Amino acid sequence: MGTASSGEWIAILLYFALVIGVGVYFFIRDRHVEGEKEYFLGGRSMGGWVAALSAGASDMSAWVLMGLPGSIYLYGIGKVWIAVGLVIGTICAWVFVAPRLRRYSIRANDSITIPQFLTNRFQSKNKGLQIISAIVFVVVYCIYSASSISACGTLFNTVTGMSAKTAMIIATAIILVYVFLGGFNAVCWTDFFQGMLMLAALMLTPILALFVMKGADFVAPVMAVPENYYNVLSGGGFNWKSMSDIISGLGWGLGYFGMPHILVRYLSIKSEHEMRKSQIIGCSWILVILAMSAVVGLIGRQFLGEIDKENLVFVHMVRRLFPAFISGVLLSAILAAAMSTADSQLLASSSAFASDIYKPVIRKDATDHEMQWAGRIIVILISVVAFFIAADPNCGGIMALVECAWAGFGSAFGPVILLSLYWRRLTYSGAVAGVCVGFVVDAVWYAFLSSSTGLYEIIPGFLCGLIAAVIVSLCSKAPSKEITDLFDRAFEPTD
């Protein structure tokens, strides 16, 4: 598949020009606007469509166009449980977390980051939880961003023949430009366009493949289908392999309750009306995207036959079905998926460092302008670290990096976010315990028990974090009346 045609190059270069142009536009438009809330949260001005598609696109990394179709192409429909878990998790997050978190964050001293919200929720002057959370953010986002950079490198290497490392450098530089210049507004608007592109690519490709396969001149490739390929129970029955795949797949849904770059989209929505619109759009988008991604994997096996790398099934189908320029546009959807996730992760880690480490610890009297530049510098540093992780041949690949980071966030922050929104007895000490225990159990399980048990580490990490937060809260002094009063009025509509 080595060399891209001129049509594909034109389409990909136009895509790059678009995302850079968005960053430049918002830099020029907002260059006189001061305030960390504007740069890191877009001034809480996002409409329903932009917020919903930005949340979806920043969530669905290149995994949805490479990892999921590839795993279903190779192993069969039994691998669909991750997609089912993600759909359930997305719907639950939009319904049970998004509106309450937005309202509570406004009333909790207008918090603009998740660590800031957790601290303000307890009206605490102790910055320990805020700092611990921000450190976890920066560490895990280095790993998560590496998966997106790796995906860009894989695509460019496959389509153009360019070396993977060179491609990673180019992708990292482009992401840096529009995040550095435009901040949250640029990230959300590029995510909006990228979300639309991903949807179009996943809708068009399998539908056209079906039409081609029904043609009289289509000769189906001969390819053996593995045992249980069309069985939703990957182990062929109700055995531990099937159950662990189902539990682990559904467990991915728990990650949404603690995913900072998705949660911050909820904070940015400008009104109650736009929130309701976002809920409908966000849930519908994720359902269609994941369903069509699975269909690509199933149809790809019948359409393509044997291919060398299963995670390139979407790439092969697009290049075989469409003329060069359209092929380039649709292949840009993979770049869109990777870059929309990376930009959101970089901005979330940037805001966490500036608001939760730089100002509370390093320079307490830092101005808004200075904090913006502190955030921009950390974006560069994290990008460099993420590049070296992605370039390491022993990093484990896109799926391994995503699994690791997703579980880390879900285990550390998922239980605490849910308890902070639904349990007025949660204490500051309980929240600290939940974050620390969830993160440590997740890391230990990943290192020593994940392979032998077949159970995804987010399950034990989330449960242990939840138990730790509840036990420590019950053993510590009850929250003050001021804290419980804030909790009681936090969920009244804001407009």
Q: What is each of the regions a protein language model found here?
A:
Residues 1-495:
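Membrane-embedded helix-loop-helix hairpins and adjacent transmembrane boundary segments
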